[in-house]
């Protein structure tokens, strides 16, 4: 019995850091949204093919606009989303990263991802980022500008989908942009197919494409050009599919980019190296990796990250998440066969973590100070918009992919979701998710040390 008690005490002591991480309160201070079906016209010099997007999301080409209803997929209940594709124009959907530095007018630079989720189904999805301005007084979001990525100087080192065109606009068959930073009048984008860092001019022209290096070796994924199929996971490539730079933070003072992979690296045999994510630092001035790398440990139940941004010289915010979607209050009963009105995989882990990047342990792990729970947000003043809140209990943000976070001021942060149009819901069964922007009052989180 004494041995068992001693062993239990030892195990408890070893597990205390994970269990003792402080959970800080969050209060809703503002709520706004961009409607799910928000489209933008391609530039006048874009190929005609790009005026209809989503033609290749099914097994065969489909050129009939709005003819196939979006669906969240069998695992998530098989719910239709009420929005059909192909689209006439390009969907603004998929907010996948905020730049820390805002535009001169105070609007936010926000990135749209590769389009429809994969290299194969997104050759007609244009790549772009925007200036977005949420108005929490009216509950609306204004798209003030869209910048389209293009490669006029042939900087991309492989054949692009629009190789034979004069305008050379980039598409989701070329890159999967997931993180964004603004520095010295240009932009840096972290993407997932390489994974690569893209240096981009203010007008969207590609200036450079830089491969990833960890411990001196180039990292590749299954979608990296040059990786031959069949390829062995952990040997021929180490980065998981959709596991590239979901988060890339710009460090004030040093201007270093801290690039964080979305998912754990693969090892020989196809398994992962652990419940942690790699973080590498890159010097934009030298256009080279510094050689330093760190580890971010995921909490129990988390499978990936959504965004990563500094709030001062050493402290940063990271969104960590599970693969769930929808409020737990609407979860399907265990063993349910009828999932038409419930969520089979409800959201359970949606956190924003505060990191101390100046505190690193002997194994290279960055110190987690604490987090807020996006499934438990107080709303005492009723800021939540009608139809976008639970019937009872606290306000929640129960989306599959929450991919935007940035510091607004000393007490507030801005958070937004990637709505994966037209393939994700989360608020209401059978309805596509909007692009929601929430302003959160989190003074305790932002001041914690």
Can you name each region flagged by the protein language model?
Residues 21-449:
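Sequence/structural signature of beta-propeller domains
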Residues 1-20:
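Gram-negative bacterial Sec-dependent N-terminal signal peptides
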